[in-house]
Amino acid sequence: MNSPATPASANGPTEPRIESISAITLATHDMPRAVLFYEALGFPIKFGGPQEAFTSFAFGDSYLNLIVDARAPVAWWGRVILYVSDVDALYRKALAAGLKPSFEPSDAPWGERYFHITDPDGHEISFAKPLR
């Protein structure tokens, strides 16, 4: 349902609706290594850095956060899917930085061009762009 907030009753308050994702926070046990990985992909640091316990990267209106947690790496839990302006250019950038994407960019039957990459802590990130 993509409807705007709807009234709870004719005279009552409106029901709240979820509007967007502000941030995704991923755990790392090695902040310097994780920061290098995300910087190599072009994520600009908004707060923190390699020697901090918390780092935030800004992209669009959202953030990708890293937090030091001794329990990392994690078991596979799913993936974060981020839209980018050019999937193939980002794939080439990853290769040039010595990173190892899971596969070459491909066109999916659901209408996106995409590839996956796994960060040093086992978090799977997908970079995608809708096909037009």
What are these regions (language model features)?
Residues 51-53, 74-76, 109-112:
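Short acidic/glycine-enriched loop/turn segments that link adjacent beta-strands
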Residues 44-50, 106-108, 132:
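Conserved catalytic-core motifs of GNAT/GCN5-like acyltransferases
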Residues 24-27, 47-48, 67-68, 116, ...:
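Short beta->alpha transition motifs characteristic of CBS
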Residues 62-65, 74, 122-124:
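Short, charged/polar, Gly/Pro-enriched secondary-structure boundary elements
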Residues 29-31, 80-124, 131:
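Vicinal oxygen chelate
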Residues 70-72, 106-107:
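Short polar/acidic secondary-structure junctions
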Residues 1-35, 78-80, 128-132:
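N-terminal beta-strand motif that seeds the catalytic metal site of vicinal oxygen chelate
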Residues 18-19, 25-64:
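Core segments of cupin and vicinal oxygen chelate
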